[in-house]
């Protein structure tokens, strides 16, 4: 079973934004959509352009699903599993994320 890795304090991520962190040599985009301890983590790499930009995307909710729009061409990636909502042939890696004692953790 994989261990949980401490990444940052939850207060380091403003509600409605994302940040990029390095975990196991991979860039991970961590999102805090609301003013709560709920966090999501997906790869920071936009698969259409191979650019490290997803943590700077816009977070939105549509039909009950949270997603982030890439800042480049606005393709949307579902935060729950990394699936591209415009083209299901594309997806980004999803990471298990949680907040424990005020610290954001990723399973790795």
From Swiss-Prot:
Organism ancestry: Bacteria, Pseudomonadati, Pseudomonadota, Gammaproteobacteria, Enterobacterales
Reactions that this protein is recorded to catalyse: NH4(+) + 3 NAD(+) + 2 H2O = nitrite + 3 NADH + 5 H(+)
Subunit structure: Associates with NirB.
Enzyme Commission code(s) on record: 1.7.1.15
Encoding gene per record: nirD
GO terms classed as biological process: nitrate assimilation
InterPro entries per record: NirD, Rieske-like_NirD, Rieske_2Fe-2S_sf
Group of enzyme by EC: oxidoreductase
Native source organism of the sequence: Salmonella typhimurium (strain LT2 / SGSC1412 / ATCC 700720)
Function comment: Required for activity of the reductase.
Annotated localization: Cytoplasm
GO cellular component, one term: nitrite reductase complex [NAD(P)H]
The entry's keywords: Cytoplasm, NAD, Nitrate assimilation, Oxidoreductase
Protein name: Nitrite reductase (NADH) small subunit
GO molecular function: 2 iron, 2 sulfur cluster binding; nitrite reductase NADH activity
Domain of life: Bacteria
Classification via PROSITE patterns: NIRD (PS51300)
